[in-house]
Amino acid sequence: EQKRREDEIRSPNALPGERLGPKTAGEISQKLQSVMIEDLIREQTAVVMLPGAKGDVMFREQYVSMSDLQKRVAPNVNLFGSQWLFQFLTETVDRRLLSVLAARDLSNLADSISLNLNISTVLGREFQYFHQKVGEGTNKVIIELQMVDIFADMAAYKNARDLLQNNG
């Protein structure tokens, strides 16, 4: 038990606070439905570097800063305290991120954007709405999926993959 706690403390994903539990996850999920997250969305640029050339932007990943989100909704709870409960919370974060991005004008993106989403999000109505709002810019949106999510439900992954491929 002591070794497990020490490993958690050393984890690069560890956040301060008590371990996330089911009751707390439910309460946080409710808060996430209405908390402002627009100012918590960050951008990370992926650049390809070729020998003898300057770097070219591949895409700009859009994500919600989890440490800032923790400070806003649950400053005394380590959101990474339980892998599966964190996964549950990210589904709500995904929906909120899509809602914020859908409200922006994404029709004239200079660079591609990347979103790391849960498979359940890709299969949900919020993603369908986002896809409609992006319109002709769908070729500029890259969707990343987590391997753990893929292997947890291969049938859902295949449905999501087919949906994404069929919709551009």
Q: Can you annotate each of these PLM segments?
A:
Residues 133-168:
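The catalytic core of metal-dependent phosphodiesterases that act on cyclic dinucleotides
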